[in-house]
């Protein structure tokens, strides 16, 4: 199964200013919706509380602190699923990731929630594709395979 981390990030690597932020700065919501439609989306409870209204027609799996990433993935009977944050959840699933879909935005926060919060082993990524999100503002999604 493909396990795909999907995230909008700032130029300094943050996915939010703080864990309770309702994300208004991201310009890739329509692409996120298109890519995740019909697939399981795994996220932490803070992320779920911040974007729940945007997630119709998807199987949402909200991870608790004690939930096992491996057991969660074993229960999924689909060819792919998405990991959609936050930073702690991304880090917990890092060793299972097969792909990263990252959309850098023209923002710098200086501090906030990192893409991976916690220790993550080094990943070698292989470029697969680039998709336009907002060409006028230079926003593109970069798709990588974890090697």
Task: List each model region and its residues.
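Enzymes that bind and transform nitrogen-containing heteroaromatic metabolites
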Residues: 1-147
């Amino acid at each position: 199964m493909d396990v795909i981390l999907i995230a909008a990030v700032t130029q300094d690597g943050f996915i939010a200013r703080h864990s309770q932020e309702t994300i208004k700065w991201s310009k890739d919501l329509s692409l996120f919706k298109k890519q995740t439609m019909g697939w399981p989306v795994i996220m932490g409870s803070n992320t779920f509380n911040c974007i729940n209204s945007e997630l119709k027609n998807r199987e949402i799996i909200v991870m608790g602190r004690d939930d096992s990433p491996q057991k969660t993935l074993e229960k999924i009977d689909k060819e792919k699923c998405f990991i959609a944050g936050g930073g702690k959840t991304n880090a917990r699933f890092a060793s299972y990731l097969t792909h990263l879909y990252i959309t850098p935005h023209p923002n710098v926060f200086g501090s906030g929630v990192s893409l991976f919060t916690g220790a993550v082993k080094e990943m070698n990524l292989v470029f697969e594709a680039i998709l336009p999100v907002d060409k006028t503002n230079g926003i593109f999604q970069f798709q990588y395979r974890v090697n």
